C-alpha cells in the first residue's frame, strides 16, 4: 500500500484519574469525523504515555476505567471505510510502570531519575534495563492480537540519550568505557539504541514480516542515515510550528529527508499551540498553509489531534482539518508519482558534524537555519545533503561557513565533484584559511 497523503495522528494520553474512557465512542461518530476530515490514514493507540493499554492485555495493564476494546472498535470503522491505520505504542514512557519499577528509570550522571512526589510529568525509562523485555512483550501481543488489521507500527519517545542507571554504568564498564566520560556515555547510548531497534525488528519480523516501523524522536532526522534507516518504511517528521519546533524546522528537515529515497510525511497539529490542547483550534488558513507546504516540500501530510477521554470525536476539529485536506485531495493526481527536483545542494553543518567536529560551534544551528531561509525565500530548487549524498546530481554545492573540510574522503569527494564541472559556493572560513585555500586553488 502506498503511503496516503491525508493522515491523522490521534493522541490518547489519558490519566488513570479520568473515568468513562471510551464511554461515548460510537462508530457512526468516528465515521463522520473521518469523512468530514477527508482522512485516508490514521494512527490509533494501543498504549499511551501513562502506560495504559486501550484493549484487553495480558502483558500490560488496561486503563482502569476503559469501557470497551477501543482499539478494536476504531479499527473496525477504518476497515469499513478503507482507511489505512498505524498502531501507536509509547515505548520510552510508561508512567504506571515507572512508578512500579523505578529501578528501570533513565538516570542522569548523578544517578537522579526524577521525584514522583514533587515533580509532575512523565519519567523516561531506560532500554538498557529489563524494561526492554516489557516493551517487546507489549509489541508482540498487539501485533498478534490485531494481525492483518493494520498497516504500520508507531513507537514514540525513542530519542538516543545517555543514561547512568546501574545497568548502563555496568554495561559501560564491561566494554571498557568510562562512565565519567560524557563521550563514552554517548557511545554506550548508541549500543542501547541499537539493542532496542534490533529487538523490535526481530519481534516484528517474526510476527508480521515487512511491517513498517516508525521510531519517533520528535522529527530529529539529522542523526545520520544509519539512525534514519532504523525506521522500516517511510519517515514521519513531527514538526508542530506553534508547538516548539517553529516554522524553520519542517522545510529544513524535509529538504534532507527527500534525499534518502523514501516516502515521508510532515506531522503538524490542529492545535493552536501544541499537543493535548483540547480547546485550541488552529486557524483553517494556517492548517491549509502547513498542508500545502508539506506537499511543496515533497511530503505527505499528518495532522495531530487528541481524542477526548470519553471517545467522542469533535466534528469541529474534523471540519477544520477537512478544509486543508480537501485541497490536498484535489492536488493528489499531480502529487502522486512526482518527485521534487533540485540543482543546488546545501551541505548542512549539522549533518557533517560527525566528520567535521568544528562544523557546529557551540551547537549553534543558526548557520543552517539562515542558509535554509535564503533558499526558501529565494525560491531556489535545493536539497540538504549529508556526506553520503551523490554530489554529482547538483550544479552547485554550498558549504557551511563554519566548517573546515578535513583531509580524507569528503575532500576527495569534493575534488571529484569540482573536476567534473561542479561549482562550490564558499565563504570566509575557507578563504581566510590558507590550508583550506590550498586544496581549492587547483580548481580556480
Question: In which residue ranges do the predicted regions lie?
Answer:
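N-terminal structural segment of carbohydrate-active enzymes
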Residues: 1-51, 81-83
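Carbohydrate-binding surfaces of carbohydrate-active enzymes
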Residues: 2-4, 33, 64-74, 85-87, ...
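Short acidic/polar active-site loop segments enriched in Thr and Asp
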Residues: 6, 39-41, 148-151, 300-301, ...
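Short, solvent-exposed turn/loop segments enriched in Gly/Ser/Thr/Pro and often Arg
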Residues: 11-13, 43-50, 89-96, 154-164, ...
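Active-site mouth loops of central-metabolism enzymes
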Residues: 12-26, 119-134, 274-284
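Aromatic-lined substrate-binding rim segments of carbohydrate-active enzymes
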Residues: 48-94, 404
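Aromatic- and acidic-residue-enriched segments that line the glycan-binding/catalytic groove
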Residues: 54-66, 91-120, 155-180
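Active-site-adjacent "subsite" loops/lids of carbohydrate-active enzymes
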Residues: 87-147, 186, 199, 386
